[in-house]
UniProtKB/Swiss-Prot annotation:
GO cellular component, one term: nucleus
Subunit composition and interactions: PP2A exists in several trimeric forms, all of which consist of a core composed of a catalytic subunit associated with a 65 kDa regulatory subunit (PR65) (subunit A). The core complex associates with a third, variable subunit (subunit B), which confers distinct properties to the holoenzyme.
Organism: Drosophila melanogaster
Family: Belongs to the phosphatase 2A regulatory subunit B family.
Protein name, as recorded: Protein phosphatase PP2A 55 kDa regulatory subunit
Spans of repeat WD: 79-118, 144-185, 228-266, 277-317, 336-374, 391-432, 467-498
Length: 499
């Protein structure tokens, strides 16, 4: 098996070639099952980068963000299928993909005119829309399988064609996105509309010709990776070798080859023999950006494990474990829930990683396991409201986080459509709002402040007035420029640094 690990038992197989094992019992406590994660991290910058790449000081010594675009209907009546469930830039930032709860994938392409403008603007137009997943029904377990897109990951582009992976709770699909501006015509046996010609009407031999047609973007499924997960898939990650990828559910992580759909290899399995002994679940997993044998995964107990596939076929024993000891004075009924890591992302350099729990985001050095090197509170003012957040289930929300291209800033989301941006160099942070009130082009975002006391200033909002139904769970940062995409319910906001 080599570094592939042991072969994973393929579950619920429709294909007789697939290996099968009896489905495990249902997972206990909701505390674990609802803590798989997604969170987003906010960043604050102390210098503004202009579009040409030169640094210019902002008026207050900090970078200013301005509105660029909003995508999606502006109606207050939002259907559940239109809610955005993931956002992802491709490796050069020219394409931006979103997935929603209706199983659709929408790809936006950078507007060439906005990129060529001086200063450059971050504007995107719809490039392609397709239905990635359909709702299914598991007759063996009498369970509905939602069509919701949990994750999207791009493969690096090697030719004019783009490839991406998308997944719902059970099935990962590889999609090919290509352009076509030519078609063939003048066939002897077919008409232009595709109908077969009557042989009696064929009186002359025609040479097929190539015709120019309006640009057509086609998305076609190339591979379907299914029947390998008993529990819901929470993460997919493409390896740096661009040949393999991992998929993680609550208890297992499987390794796939992009050319092989009928088998995967189980590289992590934390399922106990007795399910009553279950103490944690996997919440997120990701490959190292440059080392193809290294990956990390986080758990609901607040730990992050780094594994090396060269050490063993089954990575049940980690190479490193990152965990911050809990302060006994902060121990409470909710400690275990809020310490669950909802998202983990390795930096572009591969030296650091960030993790998001319910109240904070932490930066870890891969060379230091004992504690994070930086900790940024996201919405510490909610600590006093954990009881009510538990009752309305908000405490189980899955916030994602992301790096900027230079690993100098991080971003994540919060409630009331707020998102946070943290500058690692200046240690400054800012709270911004994705609001329809600021959808005029070039509108500069004003920093927002949350007040916890009785008196508040004019530009502050009381913590009691926060809308917990409005939340920023998914964000993405352009890999090369200061352009960010923020998903707010059914709308996608695009912001960039001030012109």
């Amino acid at each position: 098996m080599g570094r592939w690990g042991r072969q994973s038992p393929v579950l619920e197989p429709p294909d007789p070639q697939m290996q099968t094992t009896p489905p495990p019992p249902t997972l206990p406590p909701r505390t674990f099952m609802r803590q798989s994660s997604i969170t987003k991290i906010g960043n604050m910058l102390n210098t503004a980068i202009n579009i040409n790449g030169a640094k210019k000081p902002a008026s207050n010594g900090e970078a200013s963000w301005c509105f660029s675009q909003i995508k999606g209907a502006l109606d207050d009546d939002v259907t559940d299928a239109d809610i955005i469930s993931c956002v992802e830039f491709n490796h050069d930032g020219e394409l931006l993909a979103t997935g929603d709860k209706g199983g659709r994938v929408v790809i936006f392409q950078r507007d060439p005119a906005s990129k060529a403008a001086n200063p450059r603007r971050g504007e995107y137009n719809v490039y392609s829309t397709f239905q990635s997943h359909e709702p299914e029904f598991d007759y063996l377990k009498s369970l509905e399988i939602e069509e919701k897109i949990n994750k999207i990951r791009w493969l690096q582009q090697k030719n004019p064609v783009h490839f991406l992976l998308s997944t719902n709770d059970k099935t990962v699909k590889l999609w090919k996105v290509s352009e076509r501006d030519k078609s063939f015509g003048g066939y002897n046996t077919k008409e232009e509309n595709g109908l077969i010609r009557d042989p009696q009407n064929v009186t002359a031999l025609r040479v097929p010709s190539v015709k120019q047609i309006p640009l057509l973007v086609e998305a076609s499924p190339r591979r379907t990776f299914a029947n390998a997960h008993t529990y819901h898939i929470n993460s997919i990650s493409v390896n740096s070798d661009q040949e393999t990828f991992l998929s993680a559910d609550d208890l297992r992580i499987n390794l796939w080859h992009l050319e092989v759909v009928n088998q995967s290899y189980n590289i992590v399995d934390i399922k106990p023999t007795n399910m009553e002994e279950l103490t944690e679940v996997i919440t997120a997993a990701e490959f190292h950006p440059t080392e193809c044998n290294v990956f990390v995964y986080s758990s609901s107990k607040g730990t992050i494990r780094l594994c090396d596939m060269r050490s063993a076929a089954l990575c049940d024993r980690h190479s490193k474990q990152f965990e911050e000891p809990e302060n006994p004075t902060n121990r409470s009924f909710f400690s275990e829930i809020i310490s669950s890591i909802s998202d983990v992302k390795l930096s572009n350099s591969g030296r650091y990683m960030i993790s998001r729990d319910y109240l904070s985001i932490k930066v870890w050095d891969l060379h230091m396991e004992t504690k994070p090197i930086e900790t940024y509170p996201v919405h510490e003012y909610l600590r006093a409201k954990l009881c009510s957040l538990y009752e309305n289930d908000c405490i189980f929300d899955k916030f994602e986080c992301c790096w900027n291209g230079k690993d100098s800033s991080i971003m994540t989301g919060s409630y009331n459509n707020f998102f946070r941006v943290f500058d690692r160099n200046s240690k400054k942070d800012v709270t911004l709002e994705a609001s329809r009130d600021i959808i005029k082009p070039k509108t500069v975002l004003k920093p927002r402040k949350v007040c916890t006391g009785g008196k508040r200033k004019k530009d502050e909002i009381s913590v009691d007035c926060l809308d917990f139904n409005k939340k920023i769970l998914h964000t993405a940062w352009h890999p090369e420029e200061n352009i960010i995409a923020v998903a707010a319910t059914n709308n996608l906001f695009i912001f960039q640094d001030k012109f």
